[in-house]
Amino acid sequence: MFYPDQFDVIVIGGGHSGTEAAMASARMGCKTLLLTHNIDTLGQLSCNPAIGGIGKGQLVKEIDALGGLMGMAADKASIQSRILNASKGPAVKSTRVQLDRTVYRKVIRSALENQTNLSIFQQPVDDLILKNDLVVGAVTKMGLKFHAKSIVLTVGTFLDGKIHLGLENYSAGRAGDTASISLASQLRKLPLRIGRLKTGTPPRIDARSINFKNLKIQLGDTPLPLFSFLGRQHPPLTQKPCHITYTNEKTHEIIQKNLERSPMYRGIIDGIGPRYCPSIEDKIIRFSDRSAHQIFLEPEGLTSNEIYPNGISTSLPFDVQLKIVRSIQGMKNAFIVRPGYAIEYDYFDPRDLKPTLESKHIQGLFFAGQINGTTGYEEAAAQGLLAGLNAGRLARGEEGWFPLRNQAYIGVLVDDLTTLGTQEPYRMFTSRAEYRLLLREDNADLRLTEIGYQLGLVDENRWCRFNQKVELIEQEKQRLRSIWIKPNSDNQIDQIIKSPLSRETNGEDLLRRPEVNYSLLTSLKPFLPSLENNEAGMQVEIQIKYEGYIVRQKEEIAKQLRNENTLLPLSFDYSLISGLSNEVVSKLNDHKPISLGQASRISGITPAAISILLVWLKKQGLLRRSA
């Protein structure tokens, strides 16, 4: 052919999932092609201008620890950075940043265009090329055929996407972009379970038409929190505040009077919306006892006048949207720049995927992002990185890799999806992780960077800096352990501790006291100086202060790993095993779990059923465990 058409990996879609997938595959050394309908929208923030949040910040940190792009791009584009749950324990602290949309998109595009082994081509994809149950390529709208050993589908809300604005609707992937109709039609022919989901976005407001005078101001933190473990690589952008306002009884009355014009409440929208990001009309119905709902007025950038009113997503008609907005304090004269809308789209049941995100039915085909039923940039990016990694490994003839629930929030995410599936857009929370004390934001690099280096995702610069940090932490812990203080020997120490020393004590024991933190301890003469690396200092404090809890959680994990690593045959009819109930047989045949651990998390699979499976594996000589 006159044009390169042979690749190791093809990624279809250039959103948050697709960009991470393409970068991961290319970083591993695989010849990668990213196919997108529009190069100018690579890395577009389609909804809110922010990244991170409870549970989501942990995902971004893990993406960064594995060499991914999202964290560094967010740091470069940040116009406000905050730590959520700052007063709580380290397990639930989460970073969230407001972004300049334009800067973020430019950073993502620049990274993609300068990535070795990665080519970008602008063309919508209309079909996949299959040989029996093996995917071998993709066909674009203009008929070009590209071939690859593995393909990653990261098509977001574009599959037969339909935008709803009042009782009117039209085909679109998002506002201003056409839907993928042909590809959706072809994918429906595959032996995969499919459904419809819905999400929405609020109207955008011209900041010049808002009266901020009496609204509560919300500033970012100082110093500015960062996502990337590489630290600040650039001067920060000018920081901007957010503002807080509320709906009121008049707002709710307007919505109530116009519910018959809502496509959701008229039954026009079939897709299920996100439980944790409901539309404003959903909020006033579900929480009818509340007289007000909080709205965050978030700036969209340094050179933009647009404000994102976080909290009033809606698909009501434009005239109703205008009344709603103008009923809210500070927005009496508000000018809407873009109307809000809801969008419906196809998604595929993630239970049809292996934990590597490869299809169980079509070899070489990977799914990542909203196509798997998730919502959120961070969830999409995490899946994209994992799918891109495993698409590359498959192309090289290597075994797939995925983190377990005790290793990463990414592991929790893919296990929840591939084991339990989802009937509504899935959002990550810290509460979904049973081992969240071990899966903190602050230690994502300690958990994953070495693995990322072994997998070929982490470059030498990051690896070198990581090892320096690990060495610093161990040296500092040893230093504090070696400094001993006798009772009544130091007035400074006596003044900061609540109960006097009864015996000779070292720095490590002092740091275990709740009233003593690392910064305070290392400001005292016997323990000077403190580490210049603040991240390393934080690790010293957390590892020492929470050591007992961490040890107990690791012991709990060790007990669980026996089942987690006991593999089950993928192609097997469980009705052949005597002693299992019809319900258990049906669910096992439906889910096709890869291990006893995964089987145990399927609703309705009892401990007795797990015992029967274990006995059967032993009798058949099939008892084997993964590494």
Curated annotation (Swiss-Prot):
Localization of this protein: Cytoplasm
HAMAP family according to UniProt: MnmG_GidA (MF_00129)
Alphabetical list of InterPro entries matching this protein: FAD/NAD-bd_sf, GIDA_C_N, MnmG, MnmG-rel, MnmG-rel_CS, MnmG_C, MnmG_C_subdom, MnmG_C_subdom_sf
Keywords (A to Z) from UniProt: Cytoplasm, FAD, Flavoprotein, NAD, tRNA processing
Cofactor (UniProt): FAD
Gene Ontology BP, a term: tRNA methylation
Chain positions recorded as NAD(+) binding sites: 273-287
Species this protein is from: Hamiltonella defensa subsp. Acyrthosiphon pisum (strain 5AT)
Binding site for FAD: 13-18, 125, 180, 370
Name of the protein described by the UniProt record: tRNA uridine 5-carboxymethylaminomethyl modification enzyme MnmG
NCBIfam families membership: mnmG_gidA
Its biological purpose: NAD-binding protein involved in the addition of a carboxymethylaminomethyl (cmnm) group at the wobble position (U34) of certain tRNAs, forming tRNA-cmnm(5)s(2)U34.
Gene Ontology terms, MF aspect: flavin adenine dinucleotide binding
